[in-house]
């Protein structure tokens, strides 16, 4: 979520496919139930341009936005998250199984990143704290 930097939908697989990104989108839709017209921004990967992904966006009233060709800055928030995930967790461990890695990534996102990691764009609050502060006030 660009507003709070909260990871609202995600999925894991050994391959980057349209099904994987569709599962992540369904996860996000389940956690947020956004209004029609919400902008769904991604890079230009073929999985995001797939017919199944475009159809899922259309069925849920979302507007697709894709980065300009060769411009990583258009997707800087997502790129920054993945850099943080890799440098803060993945590069420091050796996992024996895919399941062990998935469990660790789940904890990183749901326990640490969304609940505890501070963001300068959130007045140095975690995504969840920032949302609570902004929506309760």
Q: Positions of the model-derived regions?
A:
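Charged DNA-binding/catalytic regions of mobile-element recombinases
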Residues: 1-137
């Amino acid at each position: 979520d660009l507003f709070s930097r909260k990871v609202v939908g995600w999925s894991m697989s050994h391959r980057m496919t349209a099904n994987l990104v569709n599962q992540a989108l369904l996860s996000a839709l389940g956690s947020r139930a956004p209004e029609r017209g919400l902008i769904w921004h991604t890079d230009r990967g073929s999985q995001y341009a797939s017919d199944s992904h475009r159809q899922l966006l259309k069925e849920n009233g979302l507007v697709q936005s894709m980065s300009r060709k060769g411009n990583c800055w258009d997707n800087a928030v997502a790129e920054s998250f993945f850099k943080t995930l890799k440098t803060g967790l993945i590069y420091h461990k050796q996992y024996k199984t895919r399941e062990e890695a998935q469990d660790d990534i789940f904890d990183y996102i749901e326990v640490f990143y969304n609940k505890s990691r501070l963001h300068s764009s959130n007045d140095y609050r975690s995504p969840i704290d920032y949302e609570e502060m902004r929506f309760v006030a």
